Amino acid sequence: MASERHHSIDAQLRALAPGKVSEELIQYDALLVDRFLDILQDLHGPSLREFVQECYEVSADYEGKKDTSKLGELGAKLTGLAPADAILVASSILHMLNLANLAEEVELAHRRRNSKLKHGDFSDEGSATTESDIEETLKRLVSLGKTPAEVFEALKNQSVDLVFTAHPTQSARRSLLQKNARIRNCLTQLSAKDVTVEDKKELDEALHREIQAAFRTDEIRRAQPTPQDEMRYGMSYIHETVWNGVPKFLRRVDTALKNIGINERLPYDVPLIKFCSWMGGDRDGNPRVTPEVTRDVCLLSRMMAANLYINQVEDLMFELSMWRCNDELRARAEEVQSTPASKKVTKYYIEFWKQIPPNEPYRVILGAVRDKLYNTRERARHLLATGFSEISEDAVFTKIEEFLEPLELCYKSLCECGDKAIADGSLLDLLRQVFTFGLSLVKLDIRQESERQTDVIDAITTHLGIGSYRSWPEDKRMEWLVSELKGKRPLLPPDLPMTEEIADVIGAMRVLAELPIDSFGPYIISMCTAPSDVLAVELLQRECGIRQTLPVVPLFERLADLQAAPASVEKLFSTDWYINHINGKQQVMVGYSDSGKDAGRLSAAWQLYVAQEEMAKVAKKYGVKLTLFHGRGGTVGRGGGPTHLAILSQPPDTINGSIRVTVQGEVIEFMFGEENLCFQSLQRFTAATLEHGMHPPVSPKPEWRKLMEEMAVVATEEYRSVVVKEPRFVEYFRSATPETEYGKMNIGSRPAKRRPGGGITTLRAIPWIFSWTQTRFHLPVWLGVGAAFKWAIDKDIKNFQKLKEMYNEWPFFRVTLDLLEMVFAKGDPGIAGLYDELLVAEELKPFGKQLRDKYVETQQLLLQIAGHKDILEGDPYLKQGLRLRNPYITTLNVFQAYTLKRIRDPSFKVTPQPPLSKEFADENKPAGLVKLNGERVPPGLEDTLILTMKGIAAGMQNTG
């Protein structure tokens, strides 16, 4: 029987995949899934394997005909399972889905290797096929009339900051991500042309081992991660792919420059890309990020950096064995050798542990650098462990210049002695790493909600007896802050009465004052509403003894704040103290998540576009170089989508060679999970930023702008009429989605709400999007869009042609609609209807039906404007991938909806089935069940629910 079924998975896949788009994808998919099913049968017997395949078949039937009776049939099968079997089935489907995702990634890399894809085709939602190849981009710019020298100059002045954040609806655990990487690797090698029979056998065994190890690992995090865990998680990518990926990528840039006739390398002091992090610095609504956490995270990253550099310097000591050097280097080597430290035998080194002979001057100098790095690492380790170290500050590197100086001396000496080719080897790579990563590997941004700083200043003014700062109007606040900033008197009295929140803000500032300033990026103020929010942070930094204050970055994220942002920025620039203080540079962060939650995706996207244009004009007027910091989520609902399309659709004149972008927890894996992906991501950010500056997208025609403006108003009204004003909405949302159960997933270190209680407004943007993604309804992304299109076409039939023209000619509008189409490709109103049918009260069902009708109407209007007969007709690869992925997701959706029903309604009748797995057939109490919730929920239901959540998140690929 198993062998018949074995054939059917391949046959099922072929029946599902439209046309013969990619034979490899079907082969890879079938290979991995069949291997998994064999393992499942070995471990748990044939009954379980058959059951899992039957589920896939029923789901595949539903996908083909959209016959909703199939969902009921599937639900009846799944609800009767014994608790242990339910967990196994959910886990099996989740693993099959993960394997399908890996097959897609390998097929994609394979396809990219075989042919450079045509520009602008984005057939993986995360970013991977969107080719923004650096070589092609440079050639294209030259063909558009730029001189190679202009391109080189633009590159030298460019900077991209990637900011890793820990919003980990990164639903997978690190233990599993590493196993996935090894599965991907086996599959890649198996598909190589020159694989021998012996290799194939060994790779087959390795593949079997890794798939089984992944299946035997608990997918559920049993404890909520701390901010320190999140930071280590983010750092593992820096460590494993980015550290070596950066010099490799910069060499590719050198090659690309050579190809357009530039015969010099990119200078090593031009780090095209820098890395920053919010993990351990983002305290907005996260009480777990304390001043101690921030201190720990900074020391930990300095320790990791020193460790990585020690290895690089040792490799370099092997390489630089030359004796020829310039006089300056020889004199320095003699100076080093005359110190007592150089005489000692250092037994804790494996290489070069005795005194280095004087005829190896480069090694002598690098030996001293290594000693200092060793001390740097040990001091950080002591401070982390005990808060104290006997190693003095003089014996360690505290400033990047101290570290660079001996390395630059070696570089200069090699070049002067005719050894430039050697200088441009590992030494150049190391210099580039030092300029990219500094002594702290990543700079830590600090983020805090504006209200917290207001609390502190209010406590100070009240204590000083000059009134309550909180009750002052904005003008009075500004006037007082400026006069204090210009004055010298200390404001922070030692006896200031402090609440826990106030102590936290001041404690964090004091940590900034005690640690090396190069550990930190800017200080970001979330929910920023007025210029006084910025000056308040400047004043507090000064009061807490921060000598070199962090740049302060306002984050505008709600619709009204975005509309007021240009005026706020102008007010800051027209304040003489501030404009003199910032040295001609300002960063402003724009938030995609909360603006989308506040007004819907279309209006948020447009308001972000306009706010950026206006702020760029203000900055130009005051002669300030503005860097916009884009707080994009991984999901489309939170501003996500393919990287280079997002950058190229920004308004002209808003990037000018410098941009900051958040890389959210859930997409770090897709962008930096392995070397090839990391290389592509670095290319894509660099190429798109360069292209945007040198060949900006078109500005919208006045009539497009006017129509967009009017549609945004209609879209916001429609969105808010449902989400904010409709009295039934909150109850409907809570019952039709797993929002209430979401908090149990141990997804991240921060709570799901900003404040306890309340409706949609207090819910964070992530659980809001995550909940709608789970039911495949994606409401926040499309709600309001259909109403806006309909209004425009009803108002004047000519607008239909105008919308088509906007889609074809205006990058911003096209990207907005293409991303929407991708979301519709993953949505399914039939599935959303199942949740309604099972979970929603009778009186709310008509409301759910109305919303589903709006979904269908919006989808049809979108297709007409884009000129597509069918969803994703322009992207056959993504379409095929989704067809193969959907049956797994549908099974998980049905499982989730029925599990929620059983959790919420204990009287729901279930017909029990006999045990499926041979492992649990004779046991009453299955192992491995964890009750997260006391006795309220029958055993196994919570684990099953969490597995379905993780699986659906993995299947959607742009989660929360």
Swiss-Prot record:
SUPFAM superfamilies, per database record: Phosphoenolpyruvate/pyruvate domain (SSF51621)
EC number annotated for this UniProt entry: 4.1.1.31
Pathway: Photosynthesis; C4 acid pathway
A Pfam entry, by short name: PEPcase
GO molecular function (one): phosphoenolpyruvate carboxylase activity
Keyword Oxidoreductase attached: no
Notes on activation and inhibition: By light-reversible phosphorylation.
The UniProt record lists the keyword Transmembrane helix: no
Catalytic EC class: lyase
Major location (coarse): cytoplasm
Family: Belongs to the PEPCase type 1 family.
Subunit annotation: Homotetramer.
Protein name: Phosphoenolpyruvate carboxylase 3
